[in-house]
Amino acid sequence: GEKEDVRFDAIQEKLARLSEGLNQDWVDPGLVTKLVIEGLYDGVTTTELDELAAETAASLASQHPDYSKLAARICVDNLHRSTKNVFSEVVSDLRNYMDSESGKHAPLISEEVYNIIMENKDVLDAHIDYDRDHNYDYFGFKTLERSYLLRLDGNVADRPQHMLMRVAVGIHHRKIEKALETYDLMSEGWFTHATPT
């Protein structure tokens, strides 16, 4: 990529935007920005800058738990830039995945769930609320990223909302209204179908 100067105000504006709705009496985007700038080094990429900002915000979570939410939002913002924002397209990529080492078809989605999603893609795509990805704290998001979000060639390919919709469809199959209800309940944090971490 191209080299560009790191701008304090650009980092602070981004962190202020991602801090909206958090406790402004305790969460200080300026402090996080200052600490990030202190940790910079020549040649840092934008992804590394985001990782540094997230780790910096997470390190302040002992001062207030909303710093953990800010850290997760930084990670989610980065994930959203590197993944597709159409659920059915991601599901298609996961179903049609070809292993880069073996060259063989290695689907990550069952044919049955794939077919149900494709038959109902307009409804499912329209129902997903990507803003809900910003509701996780840092530990929760990193757990999802490490253990639950599916990868293609080592890179995370889907988003938390994609995973939740896949789970909801996997549970209810062709009962789409039930799947949407379950998706909403999971994505709003009312319950989860997680394995122990």
Residue ranges and their predicted role:
Residues 2-197:
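Extended catalytic cores of very large enzyme megasubunits
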